[in-house]
Amino acid sequence: MSAYTDALQLLARRELSEKQLRDRLTDRGHPAAEIARVVEHMLETKSLDDARVARAYARTAAGVKKRGRLRVMRELNAMGIARDVATEALAEVFADVDERALIAKALQKKMRGRPRISSAAEHARLYQFLIRQGFTPAGIAAALRTVGGRRDPDEE
């Protein structure tokens, strides 16, 4: 199968960044020169667009997965999206997102309906969970205060 056919099949399943497409075509054993030609053609025809991929991924990560800006940025960088493209996509997507509400939803899901934090250990676990989800320490602290958490996870 040609690299072009493989690329079309890969892109028919889901949006891929340029790096992801190159990696997958390389994994399938296509020569570098053929991959370069195919990727160039895909870029010219707008079949491959890192900005579109970044916006779509950021919308899904924020809206469905309840992830914060910092984690989404890390994930976009891992996908091979250029930092400036990722920053622009995040600014566009997170302009419409209330980060406090996003933290509250992630916290509510993690607490499984419990109204209050019951211990210092639970507070620390929730704090670390929200950090891993890409939220800022200030936003996390404010959200934890609303569910009975202490002001600082380092207070013992």
What are the roles of these predicted feature ranges?
Residues 1-156:
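An alpha-helical, amphipathic repeat domain used for nucleic-acid recognition
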